[in-house]
Every structure is written in structure tokens, then in C-alpha cells.
Design a protein with these regions (language model features):
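C-terminal target-recognition/interaction regions appended to catalytic cores
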Residues: 65-171
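Conserved S-adenosyl-L-methionine
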Residues: 1-3
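Flexible, glycine-/basic-rich loop-and-beta segments that form/coincide
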Residues: 6-63
């Protein structure tokens, strides 16, 4: 995916079969015409509104500038990434830009970790909750690096959200 404009490390197996007698080289040449220089995480996050960490449990329905909105009027910065994703369309809404609850210890871990670091980083050694089981939980916490391709974002963030710590915000 990263070779085709998606700033995530998503690998896929694609099998193509045909009975038309089209040579596989022709198909792959056509696919690889769309290959491009990869975008990085910063390209996708650039210009989005700052959000604070949500410190109150159970406040999912609260919508404001600090915690985010399900839908809000928004002027996107016109960047190469924006043009690649949206073409000439002018998008005037930002959807589902919301934070989630984090406990105070996790917020402190997020603040201390440098970009690209995981649970084994010395900056969080004194507050790491899984110290004794570091071999198992070495990537329980992972702070994304804005200058890299992002790890694959999963649909079950409820369980893995500490593996996708925002690169420059403590959330």
C-alpha cells in the first residue's frame, strides 16, 4: 500500500488469473505505472486540529475543540497528500476526528516516549506497568514516528490503542 500512496505498512497478497490470454507482465506493468514515492505519517496528519487527551471516562458523547468532533466544518491545508487523496474535490468537513479516554499513567508514558520508541525505552522504565513481562509486552506501547510509514491501523483500536501513540500529542 505504501508504494501506492497509503502511508501505512499494509502488505497484501493479490492473485490475478485470466482466461483472456493477457500476459501477466502486461497486467503488472499497468499496476506498477501507479507506483509512487511513499507518503509518511506526517503527510496524513499535517494540519489536523490539535486534540487533548480525554481524561474523563465515559464521556464519549462530549464533542468540543479539545476532544474532537464526529463532524465539523474544516479547511484542509492543500498539500500533495490532500491532492492525491481528494483530487480536485474541495472537502469542507472533517469526520471522526475524536480522542478517547486515557488514564493519567498512559498519558505520562505517551508524553515521555520519543517517536519510534516502544515499551522497552528507558524514558518510561520507572512507570512501565508491565516491566516484569517486557518480553511479552515490548510493543504494548509504541509511539508512531511522523517521518515513517505508519504501522497498519487495525479496526480493533479498543484493544491495541497503545500501539498507535500520536507522534507529537500525548494521546
Amino acid at each position: 500500500a505504501q508504494d501506492f500512496g497509503v502511508p501505512q505498512n499494509r502488505e497484501r497478497f493479490i492473485m490475478i488469473g485470466n482466461r483472456l490470454g493477457i500476459a501477466p507482465e502486461i497486467i503488472f506493468d499497468e499496476i506498477f505505472k501507479n507506483k509512487r514515492t511513499p507518503f509518511v505519517l506526517y503527510d496524513a496528519l499535517e494540519g489536523l486540529p490539535h486534540l487533548e487527551s480525554r481524561k474523563e471516562k465515559g464521556a464519549k458523547d462530549v464533542e468540543n475543540a479539545e476532544s474532537g468532533f464526529t463532524e465539523v466544518d474544516f479547511v484542509y491545508p492543500i498539500t500533495d497528500f490532500y491532492r492525491f487523496i481528494n483530487g480536485d474535490k474541495k472537502i469542507c468537513k472533517l469526520y471522526n476526528h475524536k480522542n478517547r479516554y486515557n488514564n493519567p499513567r498512559d498519558i505520562e508514558i505517551y508524553r515521555r516516549l520519543p517517536q519510534g520508541a516502544n515499551s522497552l525505552h528507558p524514558s518510561i522504565e520507572d512507570i512501565m506497568p508491565y516491566k516484569k513481562r517486557n518480553g511479552i509486552f515490548k510493543d504494548k506501547y509504541f509511539k508512531l514516528d511522523q517521518n515513517q510509514i505508519c504501522k497498519t491501523i487495525t479496526s480493533h483500536m479498543k484493544f491495541d490503542c497503545n500501539m498507535y501513540i500520536h507522534p507529537w500529542e500525548s494521546r
